[in-house]
Amino acid sequence: MATINQLVRQPRKRVVEKSDVPALQNCPQRRGVCTRVYTTTPKKPNSALRKVCRVRLTNGYEVASYIGGEGHNLQEHSVVLIRGGRVRDLPGVRYHTVRGSLDTSGVKDRKQGRSKYGAKRPK
């Protein structure tokens, strides 16, 4: 425990919390342009071809973003909306593309959990 004299000379340091999503700069989402759309393989116990795109954001950052859901329509110059949220088995992928906004289409024939994939209510 520090004495009052020590605290007067040098006050306590504030603990600075580090952001998990620095490229968003405290915004809920950011817009960007796809520079590359590709598939990549996950870490050790899992096996798949995960859909990922490289996105240049409006604030100048370039990040990798995961494209969730079955099938997508993204190409090289598509304009996408990025939200935070990492993919645990893809190292370096700390963002998700928002389905159903800007150039990203919603998932077709999606019946459950539709709001997460930008799918309209089936008639």
From Swiss-Prot:
GO terms for cellular component: small ribosomal subunit. The modification 3-methylthioaspartic acid is found at residue 89. PROSITE patterns: RIBOSOMAL_S12. One of its GO terms (biological process) is translation. Residues 113-123 have a biased composition (Basic residues). It comes from the Bacteria. Residues 101-123 are annotated as: Disordered. Keywords: Methylation, Ribonucleoprotein, Ribosomal protein, RNA-binding, rRNA-binding, tRNA-binding. One of its GO terms (molecular function) is structural constituent of ribosome. It holds the Pfam family Ribosom_S12_S23. With S4 and S5 plays an important role in translational accuracy. Part of the 30S ribosomal subunit. Contacts proteins S8 and S17. May interact with IF1 in the 30S initiation complex. Belongs to the universal ribosomal protein uS12 family. This is Small ribosomal subunit protein uS12. It comes from Stutzerimonas stutzeri (strain A1501) (Pseudomonas stutzeri).
